[in-house]
Structure formats: structure tokens, C-alpha cells
């Protein structure tokens, strides 16, 4: 898994890592989704690849402008995801039990921790691409 602060960096690295074949998936995790972000994500996935959109968009604007031919000929998929398509009432309890039993390694996924006084720094680091999974500890 790789994370990028901008589309140009993502495209260059994906091309390098996949020898030009494209990524299997691109996850759009930005706060506000726009057509530029969706188009860039669609461009970096290869044949049969999937773009997953988790952010929200301005409901008054169209945010997906892609070639229907590209989708069909390369069998690409664009889908939205809310809470990872899980059932929060069931799955969160299950995940907590797995974590308590030592079967789900969440601590290793945290890239940086912040205390309450560092909240603004945490958001700035996220905007600057300095952390992927920052956690505020209270």
C-alpha cells in the first residue's frame, strides 16, 4: 500500500511499480472529492482495476467524468464506500474483540500519535502528507 499527496506522484510511482500495467485499486481518501481526483484515480488503475471513493462531494456538482470506453474496454470499476461497506453495529464489536484477543494488529498501523494540544499539527501533517494514520490520544 502506498499513499500520495498528489496525483502526479501517484501516477509516476504506480507506473514504476507496475511496469506500466496500472494499480489493482486506487482509494480516494480526500476530504472533498472532485472530478479531477476521480479522473486521476481512474487513470492509474489497470485493466480490471477498481477506484473506491470514500470522501464526500458537493452534491450540486458532478464529480465523475470518465470515458465510458475506458471503463468498458479496460473493465474498470468505480464504487463508493461508506464505513468500508460494513455493518457498524456488528463489525465494530467484532473488530474490538479481535483486537482485545491480539488477533487484529491495529497499533502497528498507527504512523503518528498526537495529544489534544497537537490536534492542529496532526491535521497539518495530514494535509502535508507527513502521516497516513495519525491518531489523537486522549
Model-derived regions, located:
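Conserved beta-strand scaffold positions in the cores of enzyme catalytic domains, especially
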Residues: 1-3, 78-80, 113
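Adenosine-nucleotide cofactor-binding segment
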Residues: 1-39
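C-terminal hydrophobic helical "lid"/dimerization subdomain
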Residues: 9, 16, 39-43, 85-138
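Short low-complexity, flexible loop/linker segments enriched in glycine and/or proline
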Residues: 16-20, 67-69, 124
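A structural signal for short secondary-structure junctions
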Residues: 19-21, 44-45, 72-73, 128-129
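Glycine-rich phosphate-binding loop and adjacent beta-alpha segment
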Residues: 31-103, 138
Amino acid at each position: 500500500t502506498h499513499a500520495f499527496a498528489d496525483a502526479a506522484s501517484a501516477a509516476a510511482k504506480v507506473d514504476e511499480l507496475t511496469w506500466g500495467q496500472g494499480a489493482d485499486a486506487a482509494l480516494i481518501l480526500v476530504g472533498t472529492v472532485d472530478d479531477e481526483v476521480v479522473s486521476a484515480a481512474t487513470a492509474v488503475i489497470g485493466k480490471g482495476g477498481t477506484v473506491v471513493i470514500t470522501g464526500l462531494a458537493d452534491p450540486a456538482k458532478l464529480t465523475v467524468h470518465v470515458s465510458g470506453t475506458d471503463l468498458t474496454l479496460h473493465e474498470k470499476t468505480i464504487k463508493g464506500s461508506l464505513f468500508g461497506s460494513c455493518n457498524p453495529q456488528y463489525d465494530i464489536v467484532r473488530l474490538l474483540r479481535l483486537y482485545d484477543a491480539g488477533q487484529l494488529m491495529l497499533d502497528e498501523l498507527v504512523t503518528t500519535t498526537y495529544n489534544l494540544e497537537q490536534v492542529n499539527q496532526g491535521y497539518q501533517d495530514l494535509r502535508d502528507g507527513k502521516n497516513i494514520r495519525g491518531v489523537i490520544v486522549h
